[in-house]
Amino acid sequence: MSYTIEGATGAWELVIGLEVHAQVISQSKLFSGAATAFGAEPNSQVSLVDAALPGMLPVLNRECVAQAVRTGLGLKAHINPVSRFDRKNYFYADLPQGYQISQFAHPIVGSGTIEIELQDGSTRQIGVTRLHLEQDAGKSLHDQDPTRSFIDLNRSGVALMEIVSEPDMRSPEEAGAYLRKLRTILRYLGTCDGNMEEGSMRADVNVSVRRAGEPFRTRCEIKNVNSIRYVMQAIEAEAKRQIAIWEEGEEVDQETRLFDPSRGETRSMRSKEDAHDYRYFPDPDLLPLVLDEDWIEGLKASLPELPDEKSARFVSEYGLTRYDAGVLVAEQASAHFFETVAKGRDARLAANYITGDLFAVLNRTGRSITDSPISAEALGGLLDLLADNTINGRIAKEVFEAMAETGEHPADIVEARGLRQVTDTGAIDTAVAQVLEANPDKLAEYRSGKDKLFGFFVGQVMKAMQGKGNPALVNEALKKALG
């Protein structure tokens, strides 16, 4: 069922498009040799080109171009063999050139697509309009002094990929799923780290509302939203604001807005500019960018296995559910962890332990899987102990918790705590006899036809054996004793 927001006069449909600014992973900036490390001292990574000193000419960074092409290929997009850089003219204090070098009419990457999966298991194809390269601006700091603002140009000239979606999303959930999937693809490709908290991936959110089946209405753009959760909240808040305006018989103004997370609302920033406001024209200092087809094919051949392909392989090769496969491939590290554990073992059991028990520990301790207290080798060792009947499933859970707390190897924990599974049929027969003797009433009820009491007896025997009895042997001994 499609997502709508109920207004005073009926249901409204959302129309959402996203412009994602992804910082390119490269050692130097788009048109200069200055470094790009995050967190450096202010104005310590600024070249003469970045500072826009007179006479300084841009020199295109080949690796940034390669990263943009890799990203386009990862988005199943068309790579344009000829593209062009343009000047986008506007004044701002942290833009020393007085213009931004971008790509307007001829971007490096054309249309592509991203498949997203929603919570109900359904999938949707979201169109990608284009990807173009551009410079980032510097950073204005307004909270360092009550009467002055400061400028940090470390970010000035850093390469950005602006990835523009089609207005294909219809709910906050779809927008969140799109951003998560895009971030995963970028991380797999190694073209952007996707760290929104560091500003290396930011989203401009275009939102409008309409009645079902209507043409598009006026949209507003919410600038520089830096978390997926805030993107989803901003969409909801902005849609409700627009619905209220339309239902009062007024017109929504096309404008740029900011999202205030503390108040859960958007506020006006400026009227929305059109392309002609920026007076785009080809940058006279840069030649058109011409890409060799063989070079593009070489990049394509070097791409890693991407999330969709890896997920499909996990389903076919390991017999995982589509859901579990999707959870595991969401991060490259968790996919690698799984494959290390699953090699030569019960893959579905490995997936269950990782997506259930291990992820619960990581969430509880605020750790990532790369910093897991339980290594892939150690978890594999636990599954080996289960497979060779050294321990049973109940004991395995106890050993897992001990592994998470101490970091010890599972075999050492089992030996130190005396947790080996009891497979001695004599000991099991003795425990069964004691349980039946201690529960004559239940025994009589069972023999009179209450078969469901079998589970009670299993539980009592396992309790008597401190959970160490082999479940299959306990069942077998009970069936024999109960006749």
UniProtKB/Swiss-Prot annotation:
Q: Which UniProt keywords apply?
A: ATP-binding, Ligase, Nucleotide-binding, Protein biosynthesis
What is catalyzed by this enzyme? L-glutamyl-tRNA(Gln) + L-glutamine + ATP + H2O = L-glutaminyl-tRNA(Gln) + L-glutamate + ADP + phosphate + H(+); L-aspartyl-tRNA(Asn) + L-glutamine + ATP + H2O = L-asparaginyl-tRNA(Asn) + L-glutamate + ADP + phosphate + 2 H(+)
Give the first-level EC class, as a single word: ligase
Q: Does the keyword Ligase apply?
A: yes
Q: Enumerate the Gene Ontology biological process terms.
A: glutaminyl-tRNAGln biosynthesis via transamidation; translation
Keyword Protein biosynthesis (UniProt): yes
In terms of superkingdom, the source organism counts as: Bacteria
Q: What does this protein do?
A: Allows the formation of correctly charged Asn-tRNA(Asn) or Gln-tRNA(Gln) through the transamidation of misacylated Asp-tRNA(Asn) or Glu-tRNA(Gln) in organisms which lack either or both of asparaginyl-tRNA or glutaminyl-tRNA synthetases. The reaction takes place in the presence of glutamine and ATP through an activated phospho-Asp-tRNA(Asn) or phospho-Glu-tRNA(Gln).
Q: What is this protein called?
A: Aspartyl/glutamyl-tRNA(Asn/Gln) amidotransferase subunit B
- Organism the protein comes from: Granulibacter bethesdensis (strain ATCC BAA-1260 / CGDNIH1)
Gene giving rise to this polypeptide: gatB
